[in-house]
Amino acid sequence: MELKRISYKHKNNKPIYYLVNYIRILIPSVYYQKKRAQKFHNKEHIGGIQKRVNYYNKLSNTVLLKDPIQLSDIKKIPGSKVYFFDLYQYSRYFNQKLKGLFLFGDIVKVPEQPTFVKSRPIADNNANSVLLKWNKLRHFMFIKKEHSTFLEKKNMLVSRGKVHKTQPHRIKFMEQYYNHPMCNIGRVNTNELSPLWKVPRLSIDQQLAYKFILCLEGNDVASNLKWVMSSQSIAVMPRPKFETWFMEGTLVADVHYIEIKDDYSDLEQRLTYFIENQDKALQIITNANTYVQQYKDQKTEALISFLTLKKYFEKTDQSQLL
């Protein structure tokens, strides 16, 4: 029998997600707007809230948008329905005549105008990319319970994921480390790349039997990074180039994850070091687990999402509609 693609005990519940969101859109937004003050009023003072809002939304000057889309028309934007659902979860609390720009999908370039996105390059000049917590059904998944400690796990690196012809960085890693004695890696998709790299899938629980889990960026960020950092294994990756709501740009090398060079040449040396220095490895796990905790408070996450939207409307000269 084919192995399930993922351990469902760690996965977000897709049927419930869709049910809740379809119910939301059946209720007129004016109902939610009446509840806004009760839900969000006078909570901006909570520690760390404004810092995160300003990280996601770096707009400092007032900007006039060219050809923006009204909130009431967002459902007409082509793209995945989950992006609309994740946006509507908080945009429903605003006047639906407010306008903005929205790019759904894996975004790796900074737009010319302030635009809501799921991902952006890690750079000083990325203010036009305003981050929202999108596609969270897939990306924001955390380990709920783990039975093995780091010390009980295999002294190896594991990786299971898709490798496409358009991802030379992933191809390069496969070329260098497929069949390496310290690695259990392979691709799970079918294409024209080496058939030797095609391997059976591993569930999340099976991957958690290894001390080290590869978190290579794909089209934008590494989608497994969140659950790996919530586990008793350690994420191994080059310094990230893209970021999402998870604020990958704030992660510190060898504090939250094990950093390897962009050409992967030091992988064996880095793994060996942390196998021999388990106290340092355990500290990384503690740091990573602590970092993840801030995303588990749903009330705080909701408030930050609301305030990120509110700041955008203020900075695009729409305060009169708030």
PLM-predicted stretches and their roles:
Residues 1-196, 202:
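Secretory-pathway glycan-assembly enzymes, especially type II membrane glycosyltransferases
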